[in-house]
Amino acid sequence: MGNLTSARPAGCKIVETLPATLPLALPTGSMLTYDCFDTLISQTQRELCIASYCCNLRSTPEGGHVLLRLLELARADVRVTIIVDEQSRDADATQLAGVPNLRYLKLDVGELPGGKPGSLLSSFWVSDKRRFYLGSASLTGGSISTIKSLGVYSECEPLARDLRRRFRDYERLCARRCVRCLSLSTRFHLRRHCENAFFSDAPESLIGSTRTFDADAVLAHVQAARSTIDMELLSLVPLVRDEDSVQYWPRMHDALVRAALERNVRVRLLVGLWHRSDVFSLAAVKGLHELGVGHADISVRVFAIPGAKGDAVNNTKLLVVDDEYVHVTSADMDGTHYARHAFVSFNCAERAFARALGALFERDWQSSFSSPLPRAPPPEPATLLPVN
């Protein structure tokens, strides 16, 4: 299967949350999310910036400890800024209120051009513009201990500064600054990497002239795939949904089909299954799975956490192409996520790191928590009717 911790491009480490029911069955050499967050807090000397959909750390003991560490850090004269979505519940707001050097801000993505409802889906930390975490673990106790998640920790200072630029734009949006007043700048993008890595963004209104739209980054590599596409996610929804309309969004779905049918690329999707699974996602991946006949090598499996309660789910968001490119994010392959929600993804084209994450995907794909979707039975051979 390979060494899960062998590759360190841009000072990268793989970060995971594995619920208590999984570690024995899913061996890992990855850094744990709890340890990653604790390390970031310990290393910060000047400022710590955190973007997350919500802040609900007290839901588990481990999360409660992280909250206490954040409060201690702020009281030690270190600036701590937490940005969450405008619509999120203020579960920890009372504990955060009135703490010196700590700001708790809310971002209304619906204020972006277009005026459509949206959410902040970003999940990242930036410490002193020198180190960062980005992944699917939000600022909740569940993400630290009960929800399977994946992220990347890096001490690459140029990348950390580039991610801090995104946070600065979020801060200004919280202050109701118009998008035209934002720099929306980046040093690295699809055509210019830093140690084989760069960030991509959504929605398009936060791209500016130099950033890479996240869907474009993903599609560029899926459409260039030569041998394998492995994708682990919570949902794949080929729709953009508004309150009063639904628009078909086939870009990702069609790119996967074309890769398998036209270029003989092996396509594997591992989809998290839970009580809130999107019915359109299940229908879409079943359709892809049924195409896996003849020369088309497409297969779909579902990953379910045994005895899962509440929001316990496989929230890993990972794409590995040809064991050469990886994409780690907090969003799903969902048209609405790309069109309406705000998030940042990590992209890396370093072969050894891609192989390490490919080994992690293989571990999950082959695990006892993964099961194949049943295929429809083949049709009966056609019978020629007599001609009268």
Swiss-Prot record:
Question: Has the keyword Membrane been applied to this entry?
Answer: yes
Annotated gene: P43K
Q: According to its UniProt record, where is this protein located?
A: Virion membrane; Host endoplasmic reticulum membrane
Which SMART domains does its entry note? PLDc
Taxonomy, superkingdom: Viruses
The principal location of this protein is virion
Record membrane topology:
Lipid-anchor
Q: Which SUPFAM superfamilies match?
A: Phospholipase D/nuclease (SSF56024)
A GO-annotated cellular component: host cell endoplasmic reticulum membrane
Sum up the protein's function in the record's words.
Answer: Envelope protein associated with the inner side of the enveloped virion (EV) membrane.
Query: What InterPro entries does the annotation carry?
Result: Diverse_PLD-related, PLDc_3, PLipase_D/transphosphatidylase
Question: Which species is the source of this protein?
Answer: Molluscum contagiosum virus subtype 1
Instruction: Name the Pfam families on file.
Output: PLDc, PLDc_3
Domain PLD phosphodiesterase: residue ranges: 310-337
Q: Where is the lipid attached (N-myristoyl glycine)?
A: 2
Q: Where is this region: Disordered?
A: 369-388
Keyword annotations of the record: Host endoplasmic reticulum, Host membrane, Late protein, Lipoprotein, Membrane, Myristate, Viral envelope protein, Virion
What Gene Ontology terms describe what this protein does at the molecular function level? Answer: catalytic activity
Name of protein: Envelope protein F13 homolog
Q: Which CDD domains match?
A: PLDc_vPLD3_4_5_like_1, PLDc_vPLD3_4_5_like_2
